[in-house]
Every structure is written in C-alpha cells, then in structure tokens.
C-alpha cells in the first residue's frame, strides 16, 4: 500500500498497535507530546479570540453568553443577525473547550 493511500486513521491505528505492544520509541513519544502540545496551543489561541468576540456581545447586550445561549435555544430571542452570530460563537467556543479537554487529557478550561 502506498503511503499516500494510507489514511490518517490507519496511521494512528498503527501507532496505537505499536504502543500496545510496547514497541513505541522515545522519538515517537516526544513527537506525539509535541504534536498534542502544539494542537492545544492552537486551540487556546483560537479560544482566546472567540472569548474576546463573546465579550463584545456580552457588553453590547448586557448578558453572559451562557444565559444568552439558553434563551436563544429556548426561542426567547429574536432572529437578528447578531444573535445568530453570537450563538455560533458560543457553539464554536464550546467545541474548542471540548477539543482542549481531549488534547490535555481532561484538564482543559
């Protein structure tokens, strides 16, 4: 099988098998640690930008994003474009927080 035909999932599965068999090298460990740390840092940076955007909406409308999102989900807000954008940002931030929890082993924000 050519390297280009091997999917990322297959390559990760191969690494998992090597780890399970105790055949992982220190280089593999260091590389994976660096990769996870890099991905976590990228997620933190993206979350920081989103949190600044959320803070603008919170200041503009005098409401915490969590409270807004509960009301939005319950249909207690109108359909103005600001609210649609705010809701999307809340969802994006939640996904990034979940990603961080996975990347850092459950100790994310």
What annotation goes with each model-predicted range?
Residues 35, 71-85:
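Short His/Asp/Glu-rich catalytic/ion-coordination signatures at enzyme active sites or charged loops
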């Amino acid at each position: 099988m050519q390297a280009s035909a091997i999917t990322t999932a297959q390559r990760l599965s191969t690494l998992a098998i090597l780890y399970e068999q105790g055949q992982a090298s220190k280089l593999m460990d260091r590389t994976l640690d660096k990769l996870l740390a890099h991905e976590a840092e990228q997620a933190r940076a993206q979350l920081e930008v989103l949190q600044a955007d959320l803070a603008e909406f919170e200041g503009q409308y005098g409401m915490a994003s969590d409270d807004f999102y509960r009301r939005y989900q319950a249909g207690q807000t109108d359909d103005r474009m600001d609210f649609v954008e705010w809701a999307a940002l809340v969802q994006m931030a939640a996904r990034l927080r979940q990603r961080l929890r996975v990347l850092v082993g459950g100790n994310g924000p």
